[in-house]
From Swiss-Prot:
Main location: cytoplasm
Highest classification ranks of the organism: Eukaryota, Viridiplantae, Streptophyta, Embryophyta, Tracheophyta
Species of the source: Arabidopsis thaliana (Mouse-ear cress)
InterPro entries on file: Sec10-like, Sec10_HB, Sec10_N
Pfam families linked: Sec10_HB, Sec10_N
Gene assigned in the entry: SEC10b
Physiological role: Component of the exocyst complex involved in the docking of exocytic vesicles with fusion sites on the plasma membrane during regulated or polarized secretion. Involved in polarized cell growth and organ morphogenesis. During cytokinesis, involved in cell plate initiation, cell plate maturation and formation of new primary cell wall.
Annotated family: Belongs to the SEC10 family.
Coiled coil: 244-266
GO CC terms: cytosol; exocyst; extracellular exosome; membrane; plasma membrane; plasmodesma
Cell compartments where the protein resides: Cytoplasm, Cytosol; Secreted, Extracellular exosome
UniProt-recorded name of the protein: Exocyst complex component SEC10b
Record keywords: Coiled coil, Cytoplasm, Exocytosis, Secreted, Transport
GO biological process, one term: acceptance of pollen
UniProt keyword annotation of Secreted present: yes
């Protein structure tokens, strides 16, 4: 377009140049107004373009800017004013006018062309619409033709289908009629003479057509039996016509089927010996027509070597039980059963491969095989290892007792369950192998709870007999090792042993493990667990109660020994010395029995804690699923342990009696009348406690050390509180036997300080309060008679005890204290 505009445009810059000629073609394609404008004015402005280029290079200024350097702009611009500044403007104006005129003309030409094209398009659109309408009418007619054709085709197809059905039905009827004719012919052959199978068609004696013969024989047999059944029903109704039936045919067919089945089984056995799986499969397929192949399946399973070889059973017994005559252990039996059942599983897996390749219904054969394995081979070995013992005369513990049977039962049950899972994985058809496995142990599981309880009882009795035997042996040998040492050993053997209780719990825990194994239902499990745990409660209750009673017997013997050496007042010095020596021995026996009982109490508490912890960790979770079971067991546990608590309470009372008796003996033997009424009153008094006080505190510290260790919690607090109260009463009674002067009163205060310091270790506030009051009361021996009325002004509650103590003052009569105090304390009168 640029070249065309240049060709038509004038080359001169004159205003009267030839007008431009613009063409419509110049505006087609990639039109650019800048290019059009440039081509119009480039020929008229060559000098302007050159100046513009020079200005772009930066070497001059437009309109003579260089003249400004001297500052004489007016002088320099005067010569330039005679020429026009832009001379090409007239030419450009003329050019633009001509271009505008031609553009208007071109627009008119374009508008004319557009109007013409619109008319042509409208005409063509009308023709096109008319054509489309005609085509739509033609298409509608075509669719109607297709619909009529489709209906015709459908009608013809239905007719053809009916004809085909008729032809197929006719062919089937023809085939059935042909087969019926053949069957009737064969049936007549079998309905000949009874037992005569020699005149049969060649089909029934051709070994290559055995399958066909078997199929036909089964059909004939079914038909004949149905016909006989219909005749029997008609005869029973009274409208039968006497005539010959198909009894002969049925009998002959039965004989033939039996003979054919035996022949096929013989061929099957021969092929089995050769491992000819294809022949075996062919025979099995044919035999499946006889009683669904049950005879073939059972025959195959029955002929397996593991069921007919006696050596296999002997090998099983040797593998599980070991050499003949040896006592099998549960661990050895477990290993033997694992090895045996692995061998059985491998054998069944190999047989499964053969069965799958041979029989048309392998799952049914596998069910028969697995059932035979469990009922014959597994049951055979279980009968050898699980001889149910009698509860009336159980085997002795030395030979394993009932526990050996229970352990064997658990091992056998676990291993058989594992075998059942393995056989299920190999495949056993529709056989409920788990239920069958359970049935193998049903007789054992029915009586299991009784055997478990009897076993626990047997173990406990054996342990007690062992303990009694050891104690008896020590008693018999005490003459050799010394009576005191022998008695000490015997006493230690009779003490409660936490180790024994732990062993009882271990027996029970093992029994609970077996109970969980054998009891699948939560209710049954809870009932059995409760019964077994009750056995433990009975055992622990009896054991610790008897242990506490034995410890109480020692306390009673020590008490009897003390009573034996209580003497009167008028005895000789020699007798008194002997009695004192015997009393020391009785005191030593009492102290020893006290410590022994505290050890028994401590071990009793530890034993109870072990049982309670065992119940919380192992028993309670098994009882919670059943309503009321947990609460009932908790109540039984409380009842069972209450007997031991009662024995412990009685023993602790005896311990207090023992301690008080020895304290009384020490006070009586060691306390001198001069301790509290020294003849040298007024001289510097002795600030040491009396010898009796020292002996009593030393004894109490020594003997109660075991009580502090053995008792805890509320039991300890109650025991020490009772002991402190008894000690306070005993001291009051003891001091009322003496007369006190002021120095004796100070000695008494020193004794009281010792007692108060000791009883503070009891941690019993009520006891501390009583001994503090004793310290206040003891002041009556120290103060002057005139100060007595004001001594108890703030403590009226102790005036009664103070009254008794005031009467013990040495100057009670001489100072006429009774008269002085009667007016203040009326109770003194």
């Amino acid at each position: 377009m640029t070249e065309r505009i240049r060709a038509r445009g004038p080359r001169s810059s004159s205003v009267n140049s030839v007008p431009l000629i613009l063409d419509i073609e110049d505006f087609k394609g990639d039109f650019s107004f800048d290019a059009l404008f440039g081509n119009l004015v480039n020929d008229l402005l060559p000098s302007f373009l050159d100046e513009e280029a020079d200005s772009g290079d930066g070497h001059g200024n437009i309109a003579g800017v260089d003249g400004l350097t001297n500052g004489h702009l007016r002088g320099q611009s005067a010569p330039l004013s005679s020429a026009p500044f832009f001379p090409e403007v007239d030419g450009l104006l003329s050019l633009f006018k001509d271009a505008c005129k031609e553009l208007v003309d071109l627009r008119k030409q374009v508008d004319g062309r557009l109007n013409t094209l619109k008319k042509e398009v409208s005409t063509q659109d009308s023709k096109h619409r008319k054509t489309l309408t005609e085509i739509e009418k033609g298409v509608d007619g075509l669719f109607e033709s297709f619909a009529r054709l489709d209906g015709r085709i459908s009608s013809v197809g239905q007719t053809a289908a009916k004809i085909g059905d008729h032809l197929q039905s006719a062919d089937a009827q023809r085939e059935t009629a042909s087969q019926t004719i053949d069957l009737i012919k064969y049936l007549m052959e079998f309905n000949g003479s009874p037992g005569d199978l020699m005149e049969l068609s060649a089909l029934f004696s051709d070994d290559s057509r055995v399958a066909e013969a078997a199929s036909i024989a089964q059909k004939l047999r079914s038909f004949a039996e149905e016909d006989i059944g219909r005749q029997g029903a008609s005869t029973a109704a009274g409208n039968a016509t006497p005539g010959r039936g198909l009894e002969v045919a049925v009998a002959n067919l039965q004989d033939y089927c039996n003979e054919l089945e035996n022949r096929l089984l013989s061929r099957f056995d021969a092929a089995s010996q050769r491992r000819d799986l294809s022949t075996m499969s062919e025979c099995a397929k044919i035999l499946s027509q006889f009683n669904r192949g049950t005879s073939a399946m059972q025959h195959y399973v029955a002929t397996r070597p593991m069921f007919i070889d006696v050596e296999v059973m002997n090998s099983d017994i040797r593998l599980v039980l070991g050499d003949h005559g040896s006592q099998p252990s549960p661990s050895n039996v477990a290993r033997g059963l694992s090895a045996l059942f692995k061998e059985i599983t491998d054998t069944v897996r190999k047989e499964a491969a053969t069965i799958t390749a041979v029989f048309p219904t392998p799952n049914e054969v596998m069910a028969i095989l697995v059932q035979r394995v469990l009922e014959q081979r597994v049951t055979g070995i279980l009968d050898k290892i699980l001889a149910k013992p009698s509860l009336m005369s159980p085997p002795p513990v030395q030979e394993g007792g009932l526990l050996l049977y229970l352990r064997m039962l658990a091992v056998a049950y676990e291993r058989t369950q594992e075998l059942a899972k393995d056989l299920r994985a190999v495949g056993c058809g529709d056989l409920d192998v788990e239920d069958l496995t359970e049935s193998l142990f049903s007789s054992h599981k029915d009586e299991y709870p009784e055997h478990e309880r009897a076993s626990l009882k047997q173990l406990y009795q054996a342990k007690m007999e062992e303990l009694r035997a050891e104690s008896q042996q020590v008693s018999e040998s005490s003459g050799t090792i010394g009576r005191s040492k022998g008695a000490s050993i015997s006493s230690s053997l009779q003490q409660i042993s936490v180790t024994f209780v732990t062993e009882f719990v271990r027996w029970n825990e093992e029994a609970i493990t077996r109970c969980t194994l054998f009891s699948s239902q939560p209710a049954t499990l809870a009932a059995n667990v409760k019964a077994i745990f009750t056995c433990l409660l009975d055992q622990v209750s009896v054991y610790i109660t008897e242990g506490l009673e034995r410890a109480r017997d020692s306390l009673s013997e020590a008490a009897a020994l003390r009573e034996r050496f209580v003497l009167g007042t008028s005895v000789s010095r020699r007798v008194a010395a002997a009695a004192a020596s015997a009393a020391e021995a009785a005191a030593a026996a009492g102290e020893s029995s006290f410590k022994s009982f505290m050890v028994a109490v401590q071990r009793c508490g530890s034993s109870v804690a072990i049982v309670q912890q065992y119940f919380a960790n192992s028993i309670s979770r098994l009882l919670l699923p059943v309503d009321g079971a947990h609460a009932a067991s908790c109540e039984e546990m409380s009842t069972a342990l209450s007997k031991a608590e009662a024995a412990a309470y009685k023993g602790l009372q005896q311990c207090i009696e023992t301690v008080m008796a020895e304290v009384d003996r020490l006070l009586s033997s060691e306390q001198k009348s001069t301790d509290y009424r020294s003849p040298d009153d007024g001289i510097a008094s002795d600030h040491r406690p009396t010898n009796a006080c020292i002996r009593v505190v030393a004894y109490l510290s020594r003997v109660l050390e075991s009580a502090f260790t053995a008792l805890e919690g509320l039991n300890k607090q109650a025991f020490l509180t009772e002991l402190g109260n008894r000690l306070e009463k005993l001291l009051l009674t003891h001091w009322q036997k003496f007369t006190f002067n002021p120095s004796g009163g100070l000695r008494l205060k020193r004794d009281l300080n010792e007692y108060v310091g000791f009883v503070k270790s009891f941690g019993a506030p009520s006891v501390d309060e009583k001994f503090e009051l004793l310290g206040i009361i003891a002041n009556v021996f120290i103060v002057a008679p005139d100060s007595l009325p004001t001594l108890f002004e703030g403590s009226p509650s102790i005036r009664k005890d103070a009254q008794r103590f005031i009467q013990l003052r040495e100057d009670y009569k001489s100072a006429k204290l009774a008269t002085k105090l009667s007016s203040l304390w009326p109770s003194l009168s």
